[in-house]
């Protein structure tokens, strides 16, 4: 974040115009996305987050297609669902379609969805002027909007990586979100069950369901987390059949689509995962390992496993 934006962010964080701010955050947080039946479609949110990162860094959200073609495409490939669409094409979809949401403008009138005209006409996009002006006037809104977008499209394990990738400091984003809790936003919608985490850890004997790690310090589990199979942001319930106890590493890899469960409750490693060191290559040894929950533990529901396979797992399974 540029020094000017940082100073403005800090100055406005505690005296923001909640009426105007709520409107801007609501506009950026209510993008039209194809999410029928739990389908993930983070393309537009990733473009807005990238624009917010540029606005925080240089004071302008202007994004030439020559930059978006590679940077946005890389974000979609890393954080989006599995797709066979070419990278440039995957970036062209949100770059042109976001105009219909009223928060994005292009400096050339080009057809929807086509990458060719964007390149030939050297098109540049940016946030709609009234949106950009409001964000520059109250930079704390950048963090509030970013938090709304990232938390409604990604789990907590992945959200900081997304923010880092677009040039936003996760600590500042989440601090801004704490100060600015917009009524009706995604973050104030469904309420999480505060007892779910403990029930999941206990059901799996406080050990990683994939590798068996069960470290403790002073009697408390260390780096053992409750993972949603179907993400909470996409209708995943806080229920026993949607939870796994996983170590921090395997939770992260599971949410990034490098690890998967099949319906036989066997661990699957993506062929796109690679490692050279002995420690890294230990991930390969998880492939084909069967889960062995203690008697009475609810197994992950097939419907939740199938969602994760369709919407999160990347690439093909590792060869046996």
Residue ranges and their predicted role:
Residues 54-57, 214, 249:
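Active-site catalytic microenvironments for nucleophilic, acid-base chemistry
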Residues 2-181, 191, 264-270, 276-278, ...:
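Mixed-charge, low-complexity interaction segments
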Residues 149-150, 157-216, 229-241:
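Short, charged surface segments at domain edges that flank catalytic/cofactor-binding sites
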Residues 13-14, 191, 216-320:
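A detector for short metal-coordination/catalytic motifs
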Residues 42-50, 191, 195, 199, ...:
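Short, well-structured alpha-helical interface segments that form or flank functional binding sites
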Residues 2, 208-211, 247:
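Short cysteine-rich clusters marking metal-coordination/redox-active sites
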């Amino acid at each position: 974040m540029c020094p000017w934006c940082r100073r403005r962010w800090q100055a406005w964080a505690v005296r923001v115009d909640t009426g105007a701010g709520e409107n801007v955050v609501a506009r950026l947080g209510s993008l039209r996305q194809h999410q029928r039946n739990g389908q993930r479609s983070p393309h537009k949110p990733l473009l807005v987050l990238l624009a917010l990162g540029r606005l925080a860094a240089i004071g302008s959200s202007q994004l030439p297609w020559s930059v978006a073609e590679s940077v946005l495409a890389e974000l979609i490939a890393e954080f989006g669902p599995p797709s066979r669409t070419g990278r440039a094409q995957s970036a062209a979809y949100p770059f042109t379609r976001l105009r219909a949401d009223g928060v994005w403008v292009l400096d050339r009138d080009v057809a929807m969805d086509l990458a060719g005209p964007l390149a030939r006409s050297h098109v540049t996009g940016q946030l709609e002027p009234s949106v950009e002006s409001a964000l520059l006037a109250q930079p704390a809104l950048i963090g509030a909007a970013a938090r709304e977008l990232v938390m409604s499209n990604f789990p907590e394990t992945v959200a900081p990586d997304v923010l880092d990738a677009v040039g936003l400091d996760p600590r500042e984003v989440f601090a801004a979100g704490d100060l600015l809790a917009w009524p009706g936003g995604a973050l104030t919608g469904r309420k999480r069950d505060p007892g779910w985490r403990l029930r999941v850890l206990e059901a799996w004997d406080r050990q990683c369901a994939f590798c068996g790690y069960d470290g403790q310090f002073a009697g408390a589990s260390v780096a053992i987390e409750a993972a949603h199979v179907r993400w909470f942001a996409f209708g995943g319930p806080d229920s026993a059949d949607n939870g796994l106890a996983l170590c921090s590493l395997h939770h992260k890899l599971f949410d990034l689509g490098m690890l998967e469960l099949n319906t036989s409750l066997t661990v699957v490693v993506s062929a796109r995962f690679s490692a050279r060191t002995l420690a890294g290559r230990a991930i390969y040894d998880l492939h084909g390992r069967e889960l062995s929950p203690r008697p009475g533990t609810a197994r992950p529901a097939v419907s939740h496993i199938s969602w994760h396979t369709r919407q999160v797992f990347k690439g093909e399974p590792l060869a046996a």
